[in-house]
Amino acid sequence: MLTIADHQFSSRLLTGTGKFSNHNTMLQAIASSGSQLVTLAMKRIDLTRGHDNLLGPLQSMGVKLLPNTAGARNAKEAIFAAELAYEMLGTKWIKLEIHPDPKYLMPDPIETLIAAQHLCEKGYIVMPYVHADPVLCRRLEEVGCAAVMPLGSPIGSNQGLATETFLSIIIEQANIPVIVDAGIGAPSQACRAMEMGAAAVLVNTAIASSANPQQMAKCFADAVATGRQAYLAGLGAVNNHAHATSPLTGFLSEPSISSLAKSVNSKGG
């Protein structure tokens, strides 16, 4: 089970709600993924009409919603978005995202740490999206974050685990769940993240942009489960040189060769 704060999840695949062609496709994909923790941007929620045509169906599915602060450019804006999420949705769970650069959407480490400390002190369950920076992730754990969400590669890029070396260090050092977020573009990449020991992965673009989001979501679910089982089973060591799987000595010793030669000669005679 994946444990975040006081909540347990049987699925280790988190999904997002953006970039789908329509709401029905999104809902079908989320259902197919088996995801129990779904992110959504606060800026996409519209309650002015009495109900929201995105929020309602998600709530009816029984998934836990993880509002995010996407669009925030600094700590002040992110804190405001988190407080708004609490007022609108009644949850103190928040995926903290602060990326002032609209081109590459790189998270701002300084503003993220400032906002995380403030929100943790206010009792929020903070899950920050950050660079794959082991030092920063340690600091975020120290201020009380419930999990850290280091990127594999830029958001929406489908480039995979470009930061694998640093992700490994973060996973090794962390005492809270490490959820690989951003850039995962194929089920094999999600599987690899889980094999490394990640607690979970978050996938959005790779599912939403595929030709068949519902089927792709199921593929990711299977890959995440397989990767987790492989991690628990214990992967074999990686070596720089060959190791024979069968003995290379003994059967070619002089007595063996002599016996073989006699056998061949007797049959030939």
From Swiss-Prot:
Which catalysed reactions does the entry list for this protein? [ThiS sulfur-carrier protein]-C-terminal-Gly-aminoethanethioate + 2-iminoacetate + 1-deoxy-D-xylulose 5-phosphate = [ThiS sulfur-carrier protein]-C-terminal Gly-Gly + 2-[(2R,5Z)-2-carboxy-4-methylthiazol-5(2H)-ylidene]ethyl phosphate + 2 H2O + H(+)
Catalytic positions are 95 (schiff-base intermediate with dxp)
Q: Where in the cell is it found?
A: Cytoplasm
Query: What Gene3D superfamilies does this protein map onto?
Result: Aldolase class I
Where is it found, in Gene Ontology cellular component terms? cytoplasm
Q: What is its EC number?
A: 2.8.1.10
Q: Which protein family is it in? A: Belongs to the ThiG family.
Protein name from the UniProt record: Thiazole synthase
